[in-house]
Amino acid sequence: MKNELKKINENFENQIESVTELIQFDKQIMDFCLHHLKSLNDKLKDGAPKINNPYYLADNAIMALEGIDKNKSFTKHYSIIYNQCLVLLVSHFTLTIEKIFSTVLKFQYSNDKLPKSAKNQIQLTLDEIDEVNQNPNLLKKLLVAKKKLTFQNIGNVIKSFENYLGIKIDKDQKLDDIKFAFECRHLIVHSVSKADEKFIKNCNSIKNRSIKKALYLDEEVRFTKSELEFVKFSMLLFMQELTEKLNG
């Protein structure tokens, strides 16, 4: 199981890194353009042409691009990209936590290590037990069907790990940051990022989050690079600590 969890974690880290590259994509483009414009400008000024007429040089273009970066002129446009990055982060987290749950559930069942409370809750028929004994991967699918198991919100994730694996998840700041990310993901996908009463009510109970502590009705929720860093760090730390606990 340790090797499987390690691979799942490594894959998650790679997915997070791919989102990081997307977050930084605008800076990479800007740096690329500035580098080549400045190089061209130096060649025009100091090379054989010895051009000094601003009309033929790239000084104004360089200043304009540097101004965009300095004044954050395109922040509103970038925020759409950053919000979609948040959606990606939550999607990667959801799929990863589901894979971890499935891996541990299969291991515990196959090695007769399921907690007593979990055995009482699962309640399989004789036919289902026979099917699962032949293919332990079916156990999670049966739970999804019979118990309406879902990993689309943190509350259900916590209950699933406690009820079926006997694993208690710490309720701390990083968990609140992840809870908030899940709420924002739902808002971005279903309400075009505009804060409604249900969203604000749900977020008011997430008191220990480290980002966007002030929310207002009908305000558009826009993520920044630094806020995405908080979410990324919380998710990575959560996965690391959970894996260590499972490997115990």
Language-model regions, residue ranges each:
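Polyanionic, low-complexity intrinsically disordered segments
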Residues: M1-E13, E17-S18, C184, H190-G248
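Charged alpha-helical initiation segments
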Residues: M1-S91
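Generic structural signal of hydrophobic/aromatic residues within well-ordered alpha-helices
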Residues: I8, F12, V19, D26-I29, ...
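Amphipathic alpha-helices that form helix-helix packing interfaces
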Residues: Q15, L22, D26, L40, ...
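Short, flexible helical or helix-coil boundary motifs
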Residues: I23, L44-G47, I51, I129, ...
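Helix-loop junctions and short alpha-helical segments
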Residues: Y55-C184
